[in-house]
Design a protein with these regions (language model features):
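Carbohydrate transferase catalytic cores enriched for Leloir-type hexosyltransferases
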Residues: 1-462
Length: 462
């Protein structure tokens, strides 16, 4: 069988200052696929970004430009002179509008008023590469993998359709169907946008790769419910996400970890914080975690909790609760912009990890926590049971008292020193999937689909 060229698009992740689960997935796949491709005897990996109806190959020069843009988005204030910032800060201080204040003084991973200059620089960098002839041409010997957040980049689909009609095989990663199955958490506008995105996925993909068996089954049910499913993708598979963070061993004790993070998550501290890694979003259920700690603080004031995640939508009430909480910065900590190195550090030194999500497509922090050997408390949902197996301690949703009791019981064991060896010493603990194994599963799935396509060519819809 001829070996295809593998192209992976990372349009959203490459220029994004965000570090949510999706960006971590895309970066890890881009890191691991080259060596897996070499093992399989395939040509080297092409990393692409989409711009003006074409896919551009990301060479070192373009990668450097996109890394600059990513850092700019991660903390816009660092890239703007103070005298310029003083104007929007004055407007924010004078305004009674919360929306205007957020626009004038954007939180980490938000551009706010600096969005226009950011887009101008991005447009200039990509235009220059387009003129240099970096465009990737469609080919019947190419597989285009789409693992990114395409509900935010709807302009990509006409280009995908053109490449597919010209013979390129399209493999799309689907993370969840939550905006359709639980629209109350995103609102009608975002739910409608996601509906449009999913329609493009099922109509323009030769293979769909779900990040869990649960999501795979959800996608299959969605397709089966459509009246014109003959024009939709019939090859829906699942693969498992990796667990380790992409941090070189030489850098885990490097200077890139901020002192406030090092001091808070200190190996010598008797009460390092418990950790919740999740974007601030109602479905992530931060409320139950904080409710549990409000109960714990009544008798255990020394306990601490740290929320790590970017500020999302529909979270203003909870953010206000945090800002007004008497334990803020005295047992209650918040970070919106932890890097992978800092995430590695806090996972290594936290007292335990909480995942109270109401619904997930996978729950990446579960496997990240287990990889680091942390005690992991997860809400009792089917997807968490699928991912965490017998390695987690499960608690009922909307029941902070039970969670508080579980944490208190763990604290008694932890502080008594009866948890020597951590959860890795437990009989039920098993090594989570590595990103190399995850990339191998994904690649083997798309190569299998490609080989079937070569042996049994399909007539594509015009």
């Amino acid at each position: 069988m001829r070996r295809p060229t593998i192209t992976i698009d990372a349009s959203h992740t490459l220029g994004s200052g965000k570090n949510t689960g999706i960006e971590r997935v895309v970066r890890n796949l881009c890191r691991e696929l080259p060596s897996v491709l070499q093992e399989r005897g395939c040509p080297g990996l092409q990393i692409a970004t989409h711009f003006q109806s074409r896919f551009l190959e990301v060479d070192p020069g373009l990668e450097q430009s996109l890394q600059f843009l990513s850092a700019w988005e991660r903390n816009a204030g660092e890239f703007v002179p103070g005298w310029i910032q003083s104007i929007p800060k004055w407007i924010a201080a004078s305004s009674h509008s919360a929306k205007l204040r957020k626009w004038m003084e954007p939180r980490p991973s938000h551009l706010g008023i600096y969005k226009l200059p950011h887009h101008v620089v991005r447009w200039g960098s990509l235009t220059r590469k387009a003129l240099e002839g970096n465009a990737i041409e469609p080919s019947a010997d190419r597989i285009l993998i789409l693992p990114d957040a395409y509900w935010t980049r709807r302009d990509i689909w006409k280009t995908v359709e053109a490449h597919r009609k010209a013979g390129t095989m399209i493999a799309t990663v689907v993370y969840d169907l939550i905006p359709l199955t639980h629209p109350a958490y995103v609102g009608k506008k975002r739910s409608d946008k996601f509906q449009s995105y999913l329609d493009q996925v099922v109509r323009n993909s030769d293979t769909i790769l779900a990040i869990s068996k649960t999501v795979r089954d959800d996608v299959k049910q969605y397709i089966e419910a459509q009246t014109d499913r003959s024009a939709m993708c019939q090859d829906v598979r699942a693969f498992v996400l990796g667990a380790e963070l992409s941090v070189p061993e030489s850098e885990t004790t490097g200077q890139s970890i901020r002192s406030v993070v090092k001091n808070l998550f200190n190996a010598s501290s008797p009460y390092p914080p418990y950790l919740m890694v999740a974007s601030f979003d109602p479905r992530k259920n931060h409320t139950q975690a904080l409710d549990a700690f409000d109960l714990l603080w009544q008798s255990n004031p020394e306990l601490q909790i740290c929320f790590a995640g970017r500020s999302g939508s529909r979270c203003d009430d909870f953010m206000r609760r945090i800002e007004q909480h008497p334990k803020l910065n005295r047992g209650l900590w918040v970070f919106h912009d932890l890097t992978d190195m800092e995430l590695h550090h806090v996972y290594e030194h936290c007292s335990g990890v909480l995942l109270p999500s109401i619904v997930e497509g996978f729950g990446l922090p579960i496997v990240e926590s287990l990889w680091h050997g942390r005690k992991t408390f997860a809400s009792d949902t089917p997807i968490h049971r699928e991912v965490g197996g017998r390695c987690c301690e499960y608690f009922p949703l909307h029941d902070p008292m039970t969670l508080a009791k579980q944490i208190q019981a763990w604290e008694l064991m932890r502080t008594a020193g009866s948890t020597k060896g951590g959860i890795k010493a437990a009989v039920d603990w098993s090594q989570p999937t590595t990103w190399r194994q995850s990339a191998t599963q994904l690649l083997d799935a798309v190569l299998d689909s490609f080989s079937q396509r070569v042996s049994m060519p399909q007539v594509r819809a015009a």
